[in-house]
Amino acid sequence: MIEDISKKISWLEKNPEIIKNIFRGIERETLRIKKNGKFSNTKHPYLLGSPLTHRWITTDFSENLLEFITPTSSNIDYLIKFLKNLHSFVSYKIKHERMWPFSIPYLYNKSTAIKIAEYGTSHLGKIKNIYRKGLKNRYGDLVNTISGIHYNFSLPKIFWKNWKKSEINLKNEDYISSGYLNLIRNYYRFGWVITYLFGASPAISKYFLKDKKYKFKKNIENILYLPWSTSLRLSDIGYTKTPTIKLNIMFNDLKSYIKSLRKAINTPSKKFSKIGIKDKQGEFLQLNTNILQMESELYTPIRPKRQTNPGESLLEALGKRGIEYIEIRSLDINPFSSIGINKKQILILDLFLIWCALIHAPQMNKENFLVNNKNWNKIIFEGRKPHQKIYINSQYETKTLIEIGQIIFQDLKKIAKILDYQSKNFEYQKACQETILFFKNPELTYSAKFLQLLIKHGIKKTGLNLANKYHKEFINRYNYNSEKNILERETILSHKKQKQIENNEISFKKNNFSHANN
């Protein structure tokens, strides 16, 4: 099942400089809440800048769902510092509110008011707003308030250049894209390991359930949980997933990926056609009635990405210039970190993603896609179950989670040694030594620790205690915030940029109107 990559690791040991400059970026979502734990019902604060044009502070689905975006960097400590400074800046500006520290929101009733995010009067701003209306009408608004962490990761070009020479499975026409797609297929095969280790949504509000039936253990403050679950956010209860298998999206080559995704964006859906495009008052209900309104509606645990030029879609950018980096979307908010993620997680993610790049991934088909999906569901719903087994092939042969986890981590330890040699410290090796213990000791996992807190204190008390603790830390940090002046300038500039975009569109319309009447 798992390839012996000792020769590949030996090759990496001889060429350690080719993985020296890994670039990363972090996006963290968090709900603004009132001091009593209820959703904030105010608009996105003006003091935080324009969510349309601010480089680092924006909104996701709703007005109260903040999203923090770090610059890309090869320095982990810089990323963490920048993310802390973003949180500190925002905490100072919204002193009477707090940031919810969990992926799963505290829902006190089914009719919780949620304001869909707005982005001004420009064409782009309206598109973003209507797209979110579509998400609400297609999947419901509650499910779209679930928060997560997105981890962006890219290996240096020198790695891919050298890897191409030694790896016969890479396609020559675009070896970087081919390499990243190999990584993505392996994440589908083994990414549940990360969910087992760091999943932190073992419980969910009963208001998310609708008609779904699961054998939940108990009900605390309308919160339901499964005794061995890790990340209900990633299940069909929480994080809505478009069925990629039905769309025939298999990540085997970039052309077929783009073709399949374009087909979904342009194919009408019977289900979503019933919603309609506009209501009786002429207000938009969604962008279109197709299977996907746009490419970002494809919810997957990992996806290929590329920076886009103005006016360019992601698919256009990928088609022209190939894959630039990958985005991990299966990370829950770490409730034990004030910024939702810690350094140990980043170190383990680096190692695991390098490992996914080194291991050869067979081409995806419907059969092995279903096997992978079953493994993910095993971990999502019963990951900490004693003697949990994982399917190792399409014949449904199994090994225990402990066996597979330890096999993977033996490779990760060797990669850690190479990375530590580059940085002259033992951070990666230490992270491995600490994390490998999670397999034989499931009580060490984030989901187990978090569930114990929820059972003991309930979600509201636990959430508010941590939210207040983190808020105090961020307020105390503000005077020493090295980014606060930059963030103040960016806030002012973002409002100017939004206004400029809107004014340019007004001028364009006026000019076209006057020309039409000449």
From Swiss-Prot:
EC numbers, comma separated: 6.3.2.2
Molecular function as annotated in GO: ATP binding; glutamate-cysteine ligase activity; metal ion binding
Known catalytic reactions: L-cysteine + L-glutamate + ATP = gamma-L-glutamyl-L-cysteine + ADP + phosphate + H(+)
Annotated signal sequence range: none
Gene3D superfamilies, alphabetized: 3.30.590.20
Annotated Pfam families: Glu_cys_ligase
Group of enzyme by EC: ligase
Keywords: ATP-binding, Glutathione biosynthesis, Ligase, Nucleotide-binding
Involved pathway(s): Sulfur metabolism; glutathione biosynthesis; glutathione from L-cysteine and L-glutamate: step 1/2
Keyword ATP-binding belongs to the record: yes
Transmembrane segments: none
GO biological process per UniProt: glutathione biosynthetic process
GO CC terms: cytosol
InterPro entries, sorted: Gln_synth/guanido_kin_cat_dom (IPR014746), Glu_cys_ligase (IPR007370), Glut_cys_ligase (IPR006334)
Protein family (similarity comment): Belongs to the glutamate--cysteine ligase type 1 family. Type 1 subfamily.
HAMAP family, per database record: Glu_cys_ligase
Protein name: Glutamate--cysteine ligase
Organism whose genome encodes this protein: Buchnera aphidicola subsp. Schizaphis graminum (strain Sg)
Gene: gshA
